[in-house]
Amino acid sequence: MEPRGTKRKAEKTEVAKTWNKLPRSLPSLRTQPSLYSGPFPFYRRPSELGCFSLDAQRQYHGDARALRYYSPPPINGPGPDFDLRDGYPDRYQPRDEEVRERLDHLLRWVLEHRNQLEGGPGWLAGATVTWRGHLTKLLTTPYERQEGWQLAASRFQGTLYLSEVETPAARAQRLARPPLLRELMYMGYKFEQYMCADKPGGSPDPSGEVNTNVAFCSVLRSRLGNHPLLFSGEVDCLNPQAPCTQPPSCYVELKTSKEMHSPGQWRSFYRHKLLKWWAQSFLPGVPYVVAGFRNPEGFVCSLKTFPTMEMFENVRNDQEGWNPSVCMNFCAAFLSFAQSTVVQDDPRLVHLFSWEPGGPVTVSVHRDAPYAFLPSWYVEAMTQDLPSLSKTPSPKD
């Protein structure tokens, strides 16, 4: 006679085996650019719903205390001559990348403001909630040739939540990150220190510590095709002199890149790096990117402004360039794919969307650890809230 519970365990094992076989029958999504070359889809002008800050200890604050202000060097003065190596590594406090934050900070904002959203909880029930960086990866996927990605998706109270999962390859690459690459990462943050002040009209202070725990994040609402979006992204600074003082139109993205000396170098820059800059800035409606070009010694010798809406002009006639319509059409197709695939409303159920360059987006299904990402404090608080969140958003949303 079998011991009590043995049969039940065997049944559970069989269910688990069946569960693990499910991905083989799930659909996939192709990513070739030629499939998405139609007209540019509808994309609602992003509007800022609110913001939050993360302090030097990475603690959340529902305000703008971490916001910095754009303060470039005088136009008629000498060249910038910023030493991006200054303070490395002595005045550098990098964020602990082993801590997987998932959507937690954004979810805290949603929890605090869910009843103030235009359209109410019903709008949220039809929306996709994620980080801007996750959407950026989707936009660039048709042209990406090196790095794959994984996105975990769960549906809860109608809302689709997307949270990135670090791929094994990305983790191995991060843990083996060479010293030069770590220093280059520091240089990007150091450039921000040279270009930003703590107060409007103030002067930058590059003598302080570079602490990458600190962040100011904008929370935005938009719609791509028929997909309402609520997403958040880190903002480098606000330009007090911007023609439009309404966020996100007054925000500025800061970037660094190596100096270019040949047409071939510029062509490669436009094809690859500028694509990522465009995607990152277009999604939240940031109007321009200010780039500092550094020499081999790590000094910024020149600054150049790239208006977001003009970036595509640099590759418009390049057969190996990128097309904004392809990027946005693929993102819209992925959102439709995810919405139709993730149908069960269960915060502990995860559909893991995986992609490697050259292949389609595939799906596997998982329950609980290690892929479940909606925290219990969020699920419990939202569950205790309004009883019915089934309203479908109207097209105007």
UniProtKB/Swiss-Prot annotation:
One of its GO terms (molecular function) is 5'-3' exonuclease activity. It catalyses: a 5'-end triphospho-ribonucleoside in mRNA + H2O = a 5'-end phospho-ribonucleoside in mRNA + diphosphate + H(+); a 5'-end NAD(+)-phospho-ribonucleoside in mRNA + H2O = a 5'-end phospho-ribonucleoside in mRNA + NAD(+) + H(+); a 5'-end NAD(+)-phospho-ribonucleoside in snoRNA + H2O = a 5'-end phospho-ribonucleoside in snoRNA + NAD(+) + H(+); a 5'-end (N(7)-methyl 5'-triphosphoguanosine)-ribonucleoside-ribonucleotide in mRNA + H2O = a (N(7)-methyl 5'-triphosphoguanosine)-nucleoside + a 5'-end phospho-ribonucleoside in mRNA + H(+). Mg(2+) 1 binds at residues 192, 236, 253-254. The modification Phosphothreonine is found at residue 392. One of its GO terms (cellular component) is nucleus. Mg(2+) 2 binds at residues 192, 234, 236. Binds 2 magnesium ions. InterPro entries: RAI1, RAI1-like_fam. It comes from the Eukaryota. Keywords: Exonuclease, Hydrolase, Magnesium, Metal-binding, Nuclease, Nucleotide-binding, Nucleus, Phosphoprotein, RNA-binding. Its EC number is 3.6.1.-, 3.1.13.-. The keyword Kinase does not apply. Substrate binds at residues 58, 101, 131-133, 217, 234, 255, 280. It is found in: Nucleus. The modification Phosphoserine is found at residue 394. Its cofactor is Mg(2+). Decapping enzyme for NAD-capped RNAs: specifically hydrolyzes the nicotinamide adenine dinucleotide (NAD) cap from a subset of RNAs by removing the entire NAD moiety from the 5'-end of an NAD-capped RNA. The NAD-cap is present at the 5'-end of some RNAs and snoRNAs. In contrast to the canonical 5'-end N7 methylguanosine (m7G) cap, the NAD cap promotes mRNA decay. Preferentially acts on NAD-capped transcripts in response to environmental stress. Belongs to the DXO/Dom3Z family. This is Decapping and exoribonuclease protein.
